[in-house]
Amino acid sequence: MMATFSCVCCGTSTTSTYCGKRCERKHVYSETRNKRLELYKKYLLEPQKCALNGIVGHSCGMPCSIAEEACDQLPIVSRFCGQKHADLYDSLLKRSEQELLLEFLQKKMQELKLSHIVKMAKLESEVNAIRKSVASSFEDSVGCDDSSSVSKL
């Protein structure tokens, strides 16, 4: 019999620490973010935002990486949260502002379309459920009137 645990991230029942890769990434992200914020607080520094936030259509919720020195000097603060975003930033700088804006707006438009489709499907199912309940209650009330009129004859 396998032992069951609760996922550290979402609390669902699982056979390991995390229920899946998504929860594992989310938990590691959260821990890293909290450790960085503690270091900023320790040195009385204002948390710096990743420089990727300066590019149109890109954002990052992770504070810039911060490294403590061996001696009690001020820590080294990077412009980015990690190497992946530093590389992405460099590649995005090669593109024009208009190109980035167009790409961002196209993504946003696609997200809004999908969101709209989901909302419309939900509304349609609610309307159909109401129509069905109204139709069945109408049939019940009509059925009662017919039976009472028949018994009077």
Curated annotation (Swiss-Prot):
Keyword Phosphoprotein attributed: yes
Region of interest: Basic motif (BM): 19-47
Effect recorded for residue 7 to S: Complete loss of C1 zinc-binding activity
Outcome when changing residue 64 to S: Complete loss of C2 zinc-binding activity
UniProt-annotated stretches for the region Interaction with TGB1: 1-85
Region called C-2, residue ranges: 60-85
Alphabetized UniProt keyword annotations: Coiled coil, Host cell junction, Host endoplasmic reticulum, Host-virus interaction, Inhibition of host autophagy by virus, Inhibition of host innate immune response by virus, Metal-binding, Phosphoprotein, Suppressor of RNA silencing, Viral immunoevasion, Virulence, Zinc
Location of the region described as Interaction with replication protein alpha-A in the Swiss-Prot/TrEMBL record: 86-127
Post-translational modification: Phosphorylated at Ser-96 by a host PKA-like kinase; the phosphorylation at this site seems to suppress host cell death. Serine-phosphorylated by host STY46 kinase.
Subunit structure of this chain's protein: Homooligomer. Interacts (via C-terminus) with replication protein alpha-A. Interacts (via N-terminus) with the movement protein TGB1; this interaction targets gammab-TGB1 at the periphery of chloroplasts and plasmodesmata. Interacts with host autophagy protein ATG7; this interaction disrupts the host ATG7-ATG8 interaction to promote viral infection. Interacts (via BM region) with host STY46; this interaction inhibits the viral infection.
Described function: Suppressor of RNA-mediated gene silencing, also known as post-transcriptional gene silencing (PTGS), a mechanism of plant viral defense that limits the accumulation of viral RNAs. Promotes viral cell-to-cell long distance movement by enhancing the ATPase activity of TGB1. Enhances RNA helicase activity of replication protein alpha-A. Suppresses autophagy induced by the host as a defense mechanism against viral infection.
Domain observations: The three domains C1, BM and C2 are involved in zinc-binding. Zinc-binding of each of the motifs is critical for the biological activity.
Protein's name in the database: Suppressor of RNA silencing
Lineage: Viruses, Riboviria, Orthornavirae, Kitrinoviricota, Alsuviricetes
